[in-house]
Curated annotation (Swiss-Prot):
EC number: 2.7.7.6
Positions of transmembrane segments: none
Disulfide bonds: none
This protein's name: DNA-directed RNA polymerase subunit omega
One MF term in the entry's GO annotations: DNA binding
Family: Belongs to the RNA polymerase subunit omega family.
Catalytic activity, as annotated: RNA(n) + a ribonucleoside 5'-triphosphate = RNA(n+1) + diphosphate
Keyword Transferase belongs to the record: yes
Residue ranges of coiled coil: none
Protein source organism: Thermotoga petrophila (strain ATCC BAA-488 / DSM 13995 / JCM 10881 / RKU-1)
Family matches, as InterPro entries: DNA-dir_RNA_pol_omega, Pol_omega/Rpo6/RPB6, RPB6/omega-like_sf
Subunit structure: The RNAP catalytic core consists of 2 alpha, 1 beta, 1 beta' and 1 omega subunit. When a sigma factor is associated with the core the holoenzyme is formed, which can initiate transcription.
Length: 79
């Protein structure tokens, strides 16, 4: 039996795991669009909002950012 997920989104905690603040909304938007149009969510929740579901999936490592090596070049090197 699958467990229902209760979730409290903390964007700052998500940024600690994924340090690409501009990539996170893009990934979430693309996943939310997929959920809305054709994809089955990876998590079970009472929340029906595709954006909330996509954030849950990203936070719980059900989805990830592809080509992360390319994004690493965009992180500024601050001294």
């Amino acid at each position: 039996m699958e467990k229902m997920v209760k979730f409290n989104l903390r964007y700052d905690e998500l940024l600690k795991k994924i340090p690409y603040k501009y990539a996170i909304p893009v990934v979430v938007a693309k996943r939310a669009e997929a959920i809305r149009e054709y994809a089955k969510p990876f998590v079970i929740t009472d929340d029906e909002n595709p954006v909330s579901i996509a954030f849950m999936e990203l936070s719980l490592n059900y989805i990830r950012i592809k080509n992360e090596e390319i994004l690493k070049a965009l992180i500024p090197k601050v001294k």
